[in-house]
Curated annotation (Swiss-Prot):
Keywords: Cytoplasm, Metal-binding, Nucleus, Repeat, Ribosome biogenesis, Zinc, Zinc-finger. Coiled coil: none annotated. SMART domains: ZnF_C2H2 (SM00355), ZnF_U1 (SM00451). GO terms for molecular function: nucleic acid binding; preribosome binding; zinc ion binding. This is Cytoplasmic 60S subunit biogenesis factor ZNF622.
Length: 405
């Protein structure tokens, strides 16, 4: 009596090796699926009949699919019609002409090779013709291949300007805005370095005491050029976020101070080493260009993913709590132009970090703080640390009293 059986297929085996081999067959897997579906198993003969029937259906489906003759440029709905077309007189004539055309091209290429000194291997003409005929013979395909238009048609039907513009815009969008912005910054740095080298090479020119510095018209022209240059530097780049707009949302403030207060309170925006910051406007303007033009997160920088809209960058920074500057290691050098750390040096002496004019202009009034009555000299701004302390105190007071700041 056989002791090795398969309960799923309801069969018995003589030894364990045949039983293990049975577990790997498609018949056993098929019966397992039927068992899961609460269906009775099938015998081995019935399974083979099902497999053959499925193969016949697949072959019939392949024959029914649409076929295309590349020589005659015709499509046929059934495989039988396609086979009858291959035996037709018209198709055979076109195929013969195609073979002659290809043979002519091969002959021309062989003549050119002989002129260049390249030896042509001796090949039987019958074999060559058979190979050419087999190569160009129409093969069944599901869909016809698109044939490119000849140059005459291409020139007679020019591409519309709108489609050309779309193609150009697609080519532009292939390069991420972040990469474009980094390239612009690299060009600016290279230009600044080149200008500094030119200035150092030119040096100072000695002038005689008798020579004049120039007429008044020349001085006015120089002043106008300086004013134009200052205006050009003050204007924001295309797409940059203005200094009065929030870097992380669509909020607009009347002044830069109110904008910084909004970002500090709502988005927990934090500027490191605020006591050494000397150019707040320049820093906010730079961050506005970085987010608006470069579409870059100020915390992820080049390590994060690429964004293609300002709204996407702002949403990312708000969702990930990246409303802060990344200043670890060498990353702090990015903002070095907006800070002045000379007051933190051990050998620093008061008054060395700025040039105090000998006499103040008589037409300039001194400013003072309304709360502390502290004088604010015209050549020095109020401490940013005290400014942020006032913002935080006002925010705490508004939270305690349930009001809005």
């Amino acid at each position: 009596m056989a002791t090795y059986t398969c309960i799923t297929c309801r069969v018995a085996f003589k030894d364990a090796d045949i039983q293990r081999a049975h577990y790997k067959t498609d018949w056993h897997r098929y019966n397992l699926k039927r068992k899961v579906a609460d269906m009775p198993p099938v015998t081995a003969e019935n399974f083979q009949e099902r497999v053959l029937a499925q193969r016949a259906v697949a072959e019939e489906r392949d024959k029914v699919t649409a076929t295309y003759c590349t020589v005659c440029s015709k499509r046929f709905s059934t495989f039988n019609a396609y086979e009858n077309h291959l035996k037709s007189k018209k198709h055979l004539e076109l195929e013969k002409k195609a073979v002659q055309a290809v043979s002519k091209k091969v002959k021309i290429l062989n003549e050119k090779n002989l002129e260049k000194g390249l030896a042509v291997e001796s090949v039987d003409k019958d074999e060559m013709n058979a190979a050419i005929q087999q190569a160009i013979r129409a093969q069944p395909s599901s869909s016809p291949k698109k044939v490119p238009l000849p140059p005459s048609h291409a020139s007679s039907s020019p591409v519309p300007m709108e489609s050309a513009g779309l193609l150009q815009s697609k080519e532009r969008t292939q390069k991420p805005p972040r990469l474009q912005w980094f390239e612009q910054q690299a060009k600016k740095l290279a230009k600044q370095e080149a200008e500094e080298e030119e200035d150092s090479e030119e040096g100072w020119e000695e002038m005689d005491s008798d020579e004049d510095l120039g007429s008044e018209e020349e001085m006015e022209g120089v002043e106008e050029e300086e004013e134009k240059q200052a205006e050009a530097e003050s204007t924001c780049a295309i797409g940059a976020i203005p200094v009065t707009d929030c870097l992380f949302c669509s909020h607009h403030s009347r002044t830069l101070m109110k904008n910084v207060a909004h970002m500090t309170k709502v988005h927990s925006f934090f500027i490191p080493d605020i006591e050494y910051l000397v150019d707040l406007r320049g820093l906010i303007k730079y961050l506005g260009e970085k987010i608006g033009v470069g579409k870059i997160c100020i915390w992820c920088n080049e390590k994060g993913k690429s964004f293609y809209s300002t709204e996407a960058v702002q949403a990312h920074m708000n969702d990930k709590s990246h409303c802060k500057l990344f200043t670890d290691g060498d990353a702090a050098l990015e903002f070095a132009d907006f800070y002045d750390f000379r007051s933190s040096y051990p050998d620093h002496k008061e008054g060395q970090d700025m040039e105090v004019p000998a006499e103040l202009p008589s037409d300039r009034e001194l400013e003072y703080d309304d709360d502390t009555m502290e004088l604010i000299p015209p050549f020095r701004c109020k401490s940013w640390s005290s400014f942020f302390n006032e913002i935080l105190q006002a925010a705490v007071w508004s939270v305690k009293n349930g009001g809005c700041y």
